[in-house]
Regions:
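Active-site microenvironment for binding and transforming phosphate-containing groups
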Residues: 1-257
Length: 257
């Protein structure tokens, strides 16, 4: 369950395992260095991230982040890692207790993961390009290689992202997905619907990733899915606000060490 606090939501099921998995609200401020907002002073985003870490009692953590470019690239942060700022990386995994993994959003879908057997965590940025490129599949493969992760041991959180009612897409968008995954597949049939008033397709990125997770071996009882919608004014939304939108963070870290 996603529990709302003043400045963020946290996932209760992750908290029960000693994992902070949070999604920041708009009133926590813009979190992304690569998305400067008009009139915002330099360094504001870093201050906002530090303030969030302080609020979560995680101020000692080393922040890890990337200039995200809608890839399916997932980076391992291990004991030999000395670089913490990346480019062209859209997800991280780690078993280190001294880092906080940051990813950034304004409608795209965060995928939070915790390997309950091997004590490893991750967070992956899955907008429609990440979903199309199957970042979830790649992330699980990276975890298997790094930690011996098995899907049945994964606790996974999906959200917070934009809901289908506000996610209108073009015919080419639909055709590209249908060609890759199969027009009659469960993935496509359950993830797209036509708005009867406009005749336009609407995409359900959350359902797409839920079905993908099940196909990849995640147990349904280990899936935690948010019903919140980033179209709501309490979140940043690129579709609602356009280029002036800031970015939320989806951050994951171990609680104590």
């Amino acid at each position: 369950m996603f529990i709302e606090k003043e400045n963020y939501f946290y996932i209760e099921e992750f908290e029960n395992y000693g994992i902070k998995a949070v999604y920041s609200k708009k009133n926590a401020g813009n979190m992304s260095d690569y998305c400067g907002m008009e009139g915002q002073k330099e360094g504001t985003q870093e201050k906002n991230r530090n303030k969030l870490l302080e609020e979560l009692n995680l101020r000692a953590r080393i922040p890890v982040m990337s200039f995200q470019t809608h890839t399916n690239n997932v980076q391992i942060i291990d004991k030999n890692t000395e670089e913490y700022i990346y480019r062209e990386i859209d997800g991280f995994v780690t078993d280190r207790k001294d880092v906080a993994l940051f990813t950034f959003y304004a409608d795209c879908l965060p995928i939070f993961v915790y390997d309950k057997e091997n004590k490893a965590i991750g967070v992956w940025h899955s907008g429609w390009p990440g979903s199309f490129k199957e970042i979830m599949k790649n992330g699980l493969e990276v975890m298997k290689e790094a930690f011996g992760t098995k899907p049945e041991n994964i606790l996974m959180g999906l959200g917070i992202g934009i809901q289908q009612e506000n996610y209108e897409v073009g015919n080419d968008f639909y055709e590209n997905f249908a060609e890759k995954f199969g027009k009659e597949s469960e993935l496509i049939k359950q993830s797209f619907k036509i708005n009867e008033k406009t005749g336009k397709y609407h995409f359900d990125n959350i359902t797409f990733n839920r079905i993908m997770a099940l196909k990849l071996g995640i147990k349904e009882e280990n899936l935690v899915i948010s019903q919140e919608n980033t179209w709501n004014e309490k979140f940043y939304s690129h579709r609602r606000e356009g280029k002036k939108s800031g970015r939320a963070t989806a951050m994951i870290s171990f609680n104590g060490f």
